Swiss-Prot record:
This is Stringent starvation protein B. Residues 134-143 have a biased composition (Basic and acidic residues). Enhances recognition of ssrA-tagged proteins by the ClpX-ClpP protease; the ssrA degradation tag (AANDENYALAA) is added trans-translationally to proteins that are stalled on the ribosome, freeing the ribosome and targeting stalled peptides for degradation. SspB activates the ATPase activity of ClpX. Seems to act in concert with SspA in the regulation of several proteins during exponential and stationary-phase growth. InterPro entries: SspB, SspB-like_sf. Homodimer. Binds 1 ssrA-tag per monomer; if the first Asn residue of the ssrA tag is mutated to Ala, SspB no longer binds the protein or stimulates ClpX-ClpP degradation. Binds the N-terminus (residues 1-108) of RseA with and without sigma-E; although ssrA and the N-terminal fragment of RseA both bind to SspB competitively they bind in opposite directions in its peptide-binding groove. Residues 119-165 are annotated as: Disordered. GO terms for molecular function: ATPase binding; molecular adaptor activity; protein homodimerization activity; RNA binding. The gene is sspB. The keyword Transferase does not apply. GO terms for biological process: positive regulation of ATP-dependent activity; positive regulation of protein catabolic process; positive regulation of proteolysis involved in protein catabolic process. Residues 73-95 are annotated as: Binds SspB. Disruption phenotype: Decreased degradation of ssrA-tagged proteins by ClpX-ClpP, no effect on degradation by ClpA-ClpP protease. Delayed and decreased induction of the extracytoplasmic-stress response. It comes from Escherichia coli (strain K12). The keyword Metal-binding does not apply. NCBIfam families: PRK11798.1-1, PRK11798.1-2, PRK11798.2-5.
Amino acid sequence: MDLSQLTPRRPYLLRAFYEWLLDNQLTPHLVVDVTLPGVQVPMEYARDGQIVLNIAPRAVGNLELANDEVRFNARFGGIPRQVSVPLAAVLAIYARENGAGTMFEPEAAYDEDTSIMNDEEASADNETVMSVIDGDKPDHDDDTHPDDEPPQPPRGGRPALRVVK
């Protein structure tokens, strides 16, 4: 059987590396190409056409590593969101602690899927890029990043205790 007739390896390798990283008490992260069609991620956290997503069990809910896409729920800046990433957009999986993992090589099946999805999106009028899960909306738009340090509490002199009888 010709290699082009086989199903893509990426979903199987992704699941294997994910389990291996967890078995070794490491934190799995996905590198995603946000420029490909069908990617639903919080674009405000993307840099240079990519986003890195923590997919550790403590960071996400309802994680599905399916054969066609990765789906999960997560909070970004306190806002619950649903993330969906086609496997063609998954570039790598690695451990935050030591970089162990792999980059995925291009596969012909994903090149065909991407061209089909580009054609479909060109004919679509309107598509939601990112949706809020439970209707929560931020009260204000701020430019904070998840890696920023938390704000320092105000300094107001000595703390005071009082006796309550």
